[in-house]
Amino acid sequence: MRPFFQSLALAVVLACAPTAGPAAPAAPASEPDFAGLSLSLSEEAGFFPSDNLVSNETSYQHVLGKMAAMGVRGGAYVGVGPDQNFTYIAAIRPEIAYIIDIRHDNLLHHLLFKATFQVARTRLEFVSILTGRPAHGDGRDNPGIEEIVARIDTTPADSQYFEGMATRIADVILSWDMPVTDAELRVVRRIHEAFRRYGLNLRYAQVPRYPTWRELILEKDLEGRRANYLATDSAFRFVQDLERRHRVVPVVGDVAGSHALAAIGENIRIRGLRLTALYISNVEQYLMRGGTFLPYASTLQALPWAEHGVIIRSYFGRGASLPQSVYGHYSTQLLERSTDFINQMQAGGYGSYIDLVTRNALPLKTGVGTGAEAGIQRRFSGSTPAAAWLP
């Protein structure tokens, strides 16, 4: 058992005070112990071959407009991976969010994010602290996202500043009474050092085909708007407030396992909430390969879904495009109604991974059909001839 879980095993508090429907989130004092809640929902970590410090999905914003049109808002959110979750959280505005990942390091990664949200006064300061680049001045200005990127890019990493911030981050993490070990704090520092070393050039893997963190921050939705959580002060402040009130809960677990995802569902149910969105990336591809998709699907069907609940997926076709694919993007973002997923599973399930990601995938562009023309969108502003995209 991991040290984090060993230290808390005798102090788990499973009870959560329920809240009324759409009412405002309760004050922090009414929340269970943050560490205890994280532990109670978690299970033993598993293996994944990469660190996933930032996303590799340039298409991650392409579902935002469709979700807004469908009324996907409020309730509870569940996602996997690093900070692309914050963009979905900023758009959906849930009352609570759970980040589940098979990797224990992802929990520690989110403790780094959480502490940085607590320390930072502005978006610029948030990026400065993570990258070890003191570009924020007195912390009182509020530049646009392009200027934030430019300031970080033109400010060299500063060892003294980084060391001071790394120490402060560790102190903040320990102030939550998290029983993290010295070894786990070293993992937090290792992740922090990767942000310092590469700055905005940090990638999912340091090879050219993956986007940099800079590119991910500056990406746009299908309407041409920059909608990353760092793009506007309003988006950043919502996520920051949720983090400061311990409403972004990192969970260690296999989504096909017997405990973590089901426990999250029960925690949502106890609170009187409904699950509005599950961001699963391309995890289901690995589940189908490993023969564990059916246990996962069974758990999904039992979750307390909202009426307009959705499943957000990422598809990596290695050259094969889908109707929702956008020219210039290595990934394709997909959206399925939870009701469609449940109905299909009850009708016999999906025949393959490609069947899963295509059968009930919604068109994402308003006013565009489900045929190949739905995918003819330009990554940035402007247009691209159909012949350049169509297979």
PLM ranges: what are they?
Residues 26-69, 76:
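Mature N-terminal segment immediately following signal peptide/propeptide cleavage
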Residues 260-264, 286-298:
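A short, conserved alpha-helix within the catalytic core of class I
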Residues 83, 256, 273-290:
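A short SAM/SAH-binding and catalytic strip from SAM-dependent methyltransferases
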Residues 291-390:
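C-terminal regions of proteins
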Residues 6-17:
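Bacterial N-terminal signal peptides
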Residues 96-249, 345-382, 389:
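Class I S-adenosyl-L-methionine-dependent methyltransferase module
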Residues 71-85, 97-98:
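Conserved class I S-adenosyl-L-methionine
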Residues 228-235, 253-266:
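A Trp-anchored, charged/polar loop motif used as the substrate-binding/catalytic surface
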